């Protein structure tokens, strides 16, 4: 059975199968969205990998990266949020819902998944949870 829980631990220290974070399209390329709380060295590593893979950050694009130094998760799933900046903290709930669903559809069979998308308020958090649930069942 699928369940959702909240934690105050930083995403990098969660011993999960997959960690989901967001990416955005910027005028300069692809960047990570806020909400991931990853250490700077991990951000630099992920940015380099995303550039090598020619990730765009477009809405619902999903890229899986394994063996991210400093991250306990087995893999990091980066899901696109569309146009934005690395400092933008709010996204439409439909975008968050869709991004979470797209990411979760790619991790079928994984027992534990942590989602660290930008959720500045309870409505955004609810949208991410709804999308994650939908992604598990599609």
Placement of each model-derived feature along the sequence:
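Glycine-/small-residue-enriched capping loops at alpha/beta junctions
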Residues: 1-138
């Amino acid at each position: 059975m699928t369940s959702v829980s909240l934690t105050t631990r930083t995403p990098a220290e969660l011993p999960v199968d997959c960690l989901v974070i967001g990416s955005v399209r910027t005028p300069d390329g692809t960047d990570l969205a806020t909400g991931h709380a990853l250490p700077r060295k991990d951000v630099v590593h992920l940015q380099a990998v995303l550039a090598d893979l020619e990730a765009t950050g477009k809405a619902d694009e999903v890229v899986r990266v394994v063996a991210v130094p400093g991250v306990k998760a087995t893999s990091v799933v980066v899901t696109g949020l569309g146009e934005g900046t690395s400092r933008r903290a709010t996204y439409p709930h439909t975008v968050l819902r869709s991004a979470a669903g797209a990411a979760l559809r790619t991790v079928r069979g994984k027992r534990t998944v942590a989602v660290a998308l930008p959720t500045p308020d309870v409505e955004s958090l609810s949208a991410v949870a709804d999308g994650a649930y939908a992604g598990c069942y599609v």
